[in-house]
Structures are given as structure tokens and as C-alpha cells.
């Protein structure tokens, strides 16, 4: 109820004379309410999206990430997924790219997920050093987890070739360790990674990953 009160008091848009604390409270309240599909916040976010539909980068940066997430949660269409990916490719704003990566991961349609996975190996869409952010966001979502985990295993040789000299390569060992929490996923993690402990560059992270998941199961 407190978040609803904060939203009713502060609204969606920043106002003249507001304090930094007001903005922080707004962000926290909106994040919770949009995740909870609280209709007044959902409708307000949708209204902001519609007002900027022709140029979603122009959505006020302070609420843009939440507006993009809300639209994906509510619309969940292949067209919107394509729009977000196209915006990702054309923008020069790294913060906007991060917001788009997070927002598109809220999709719950297989067609959209297949489309995204089809783009990940195209360096003109996703730079190899940014791939881990897409992996982390999608792997953490229950709808996408199985498909994305299998994609990573199936494309491991390509990931290793593309990122073997980049520090973000370690993320593909560490990210699932930070997310997985079932015995089934632990067994899969061990089956895939344990044979790779002969690679000294990966051994420590793999063994730590196994311990991390096991402690959570």
C-alpha cells in the first residue's frame, strides 16, 4: 500500500521543485508497481510509451527503462521485440541499450525469443563484449531460461572463440551459477562444465559455480 500511496502522491512525471529523494521514491514505487501489474501505474506507463512511440529513445530517461519493460509485459509481440532490437542497433546511448536489453527479456512469446537468439551472433547487432548482458537478462527469466541455457551450450564453441580473450567470457560460467537454484540445473551445470575444468582459465570459476548453486539447492 505504501508504494501505491507514493505513486498517488508523486505520479509518473517529475515536477518542478521535487527533491532527489522524491525521484528515488518514485523510481522504487514504479518499479514495484509495474512488476506487480498495478493497473494505474501500468496505464500511466503505457500512456507515456504511446506519446513517444515514434521515437522511444525520447522517453524521459528517468522512467524510460520502466516504460519499456511495462510495454513488453503488456504487449508481448514480435513486432515490439523487433522494434526494441532495431532501436538497440541504431542508438549511440549505452544506457538506452542496457534498458532495451533488460526490457526485451520480459517477452513471453517463443517467436520473439527465437528472433532474439537469431540476432545474438551478429556482431552488427550485439557486440561480442555486450553479449553477457543479454545472456544474464534472459537466463534470469523463467520463460526464457531453458531455451537460452540450451542456446549457450549449443553455441559454446562460438562464444569461446568470440570472447576467449575478453574478461566477459568468464561471465558465461558465472552468470548461471548466480541464477540457477534447482537440483536439475545443478546437474546440468556440472554435466556441461565439469569436463572443462581441464581449462585452467575456467577451472576456478567452474568449481566455485558448482559450490554456489549447490549451496542454494
Task: Locate each region found by the language model.
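Long, ordered, helix-rich scaffold segments
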Residues: 1-217
Amino acid at each position: 500500500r505504501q508504494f501505491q500511496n507514493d505513486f498517488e502522491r508523486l505520479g509518473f512525471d517529475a515536477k518542478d521543485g521535487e527533491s532527489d529523494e522524491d525521484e528515488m521514491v518514485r523510481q522504487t514505487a514504479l518499479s514495484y508497481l509495474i512488476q506487480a501489474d498495478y493497473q494505474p501505474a501500468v496505464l500511466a506507463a503505457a500512456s507515456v510509451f504511446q506519446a513517444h512511440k515514434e521515437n522511444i529513445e525520447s522517453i524521459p530517461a528517468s522512467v524510460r527503462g520502466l516504460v519499456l519493460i511495462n510495454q513488453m509485459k503488456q504487449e508481448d509481440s514480435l513486432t515490439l521485440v523487433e522494434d526494441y532490437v532495431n532501436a538497440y542497433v541504431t542508438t549511440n546511448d549505452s544506457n538506452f541499450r542496457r534498458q532495451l536489453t533488460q526490457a526485451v527479456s520480459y517477452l513471453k512469446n517463443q517467436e520473439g525469443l527465437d528472433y532474439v537468439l537469431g540476432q545474438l551472433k551478429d556482431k552488427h547487432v550485439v557486440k561480442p563484449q555486450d553479449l553477457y548482458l543479454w545472456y544474464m537478462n534472459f537466463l534470469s527469466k523463467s520463460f526464457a531460461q531453458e531455451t537460452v541455457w540450451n542456446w549457450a551450450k549449443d553455441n559454446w564453441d562460438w562464444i569461446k572463440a568470440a570472447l576467449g580473450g575478453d574478461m566477459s567470457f568468464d561471465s558465461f560460467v558465472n552468470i548461471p551459477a548466480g541464477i540457477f537454484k534447482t537440483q536439475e540445473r545443478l546437474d546440468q551445470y556440472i554435466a556441461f562444465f565439469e569436463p572443462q575444468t581441464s581449462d585452467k582459465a575456467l577451472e576456478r570459476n567452474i568449481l566455485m559455480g558448482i559450490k554456489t548453486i549447490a549451496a542454494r539447492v
